[in-house]
């Protein structure tokens, strides 16, 4: 047992110094549990409350699309230059070295392909496996206005409930329903529904008109998808406008790994997201880095 005679009474209690409570300032996440906040603080840089994610989960329904034929050759060299990796568990286990030491957002929905109805997805990963992989969030598509809208919302609810049990954030990714136009009204509806169901992060698309209303009406952080490949200057302009209008980051794939200089593009995107560089200066950085 302890030698009680050798235990010295504490003296420096700082009685005149009130204890400070640290605030978790990420939008809408201040009341979450410690484990949930810890994972979110790995995804979002605590200094900026923003993030740059590299998405290479496309193969779960597209197969080996252009740029993703060989993850080890095309994507692995980009890992050091991004904040977060977004991929499936199959790619994570087979292609991402455990020593990479980057937070992972795990694609947790699937069971569909480009040959069938995309909205017909299921939860494709058990929460226990996500915990085993030590990821920082799970992600699933939500298809508002689609044939399988109800099913996709239930997928989000299932992940949120399981995530709350274990301290695992859920990112809802807004797919586009066939019967709705890709505009501010649609994405305001889709992002708000996903947030109301409890998702802690929303991934959606940038729109030229009214994006600030989408971001303002969503009570949790929004990150924008890169979408189809754009010329680098246009992609950087989209990033800048989204951040300027309230997005908390980007989750880009094709506009990174299909770029003529992927590392340079990632550095330029980082400058926009974390350093508030405008698109012109970021493009100049891209040009200088690609040489």
From Swiss-Prot:
CDD domains linked: DhnA (cd00958)
Active site, renumbered: 203 (schiff-base intermediate with substrate)
One of the record's GO molecular function terms: acyltransferase activity, transferring groups other than amino-acyl groups
InterPro entries from the UniProt entry: Aldolase_TIM, DeoC/FbaB/LacD_aldolase, DeoC/FbaB_aldolase, FbaB-like, LsrF
EC number(s) per entry: 2.3.1.245
Reactions accelerated catalytically: dihydroxyacetone phosphate + acetyl-CoA = 3-hydroxy-2,4-dioxopentyl phosphate + CoA
Cellular compartments per GO CC: cytoplasm
Pfam families per the UniProt record, alphabetical: DeoC
Entries under SUPFAM superfamilies matching the protein: Aldolase
Subcellular location: Cytoplasm
Main location: cytoplasm
Domain of life: Bacteria
Disulfide bonds: none
Top-tier EC class: transferase
Keywords, comma-separated and alphabetical: Cytoplasm, Schiff base, Transferase
Family the entry assigns: Belongs to the DeoC/FbaB aldolase family.
Annotated function: Involved in the degradation of phospho-AI-2, thereby terminating induction of the lsr operon and closing the AI-2 signaling cycle. Catalyzes the transfer of an acetyl moiety from 3-hydroxy-5-phosphonooxypentane-2,4-dione to CoA to form glycerone phosphate and acetyl-CoA.
Classification via PANTHER family: 3-HYDROXY-5-PHOSPHONOOXYPENTANE-2,4-DIONE THIOLASE, FRUCTOSE-BISPHOSPHATE ALDOLASE CLASS 1
Subunit and partners: Homodecamer.
Name listed for the protein in its UniProt record: 3-hydroxy-5-phosphonooxypentane-2,4-dione thiolase
């Amino acid at each position: 047992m302890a030698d009680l005679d050798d235990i010295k009474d504490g003296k420096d209690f700082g009685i005149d110094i009130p204890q400070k409570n640290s605030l978790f300032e990420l939008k809408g996440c201040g009341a979450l549990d410690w484990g949930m906040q810890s994972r979110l603080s790995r995804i979002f840089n605590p200094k900026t409350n923003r993030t740059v994610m590299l998405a290479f989960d496309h193969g779960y329904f597209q197969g080996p699309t252009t740029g993703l034929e060989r993850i080890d050759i095309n994507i692995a060299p980009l890992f050091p230059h991004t904040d977060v990796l977004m991929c499936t568990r199959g790619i994570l286990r087979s292609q991402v070295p455990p020593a990479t030491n980057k937070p992972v957002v795990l694609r947790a929905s699937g069971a569909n392909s480009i040959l069938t109805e995309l909205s017909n997805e299921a939860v494709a990963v058990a929460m226990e496996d996500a915990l085993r992989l030590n990821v920082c969030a799970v992600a699933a598509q939500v298809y508002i206005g689609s044939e399988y809208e109800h099913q996709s919302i239930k997928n989000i609810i299932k992940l949120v409930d399981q995530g709350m049990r274990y301290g695992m954030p859920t990112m809802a990714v807004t797919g586009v329903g066939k019967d709705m136009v890709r505009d501010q009204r649609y994405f305001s509806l889709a992002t708000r529904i996903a947030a109301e169901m409890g998702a802690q992060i929303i991934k959606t698309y940038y729109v030229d008109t009214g994006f600030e209303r989408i971001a303002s009406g969503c009570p949790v952080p929004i990150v924008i998808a890169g979408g189809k490949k754009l010329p680098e200057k246009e992609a950087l302009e989209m990033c800048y406008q989204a951040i300027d209008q309230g997005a908390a980051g980007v989750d880009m794939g094709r506009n990174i790994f299909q770029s003529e200089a992927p590392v340079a593009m990632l550095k330029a995107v980082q400058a926009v997201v974390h350093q508030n560089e405008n698109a012109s200066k970021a493009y100049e950085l891209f040009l200088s880095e690609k040489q």
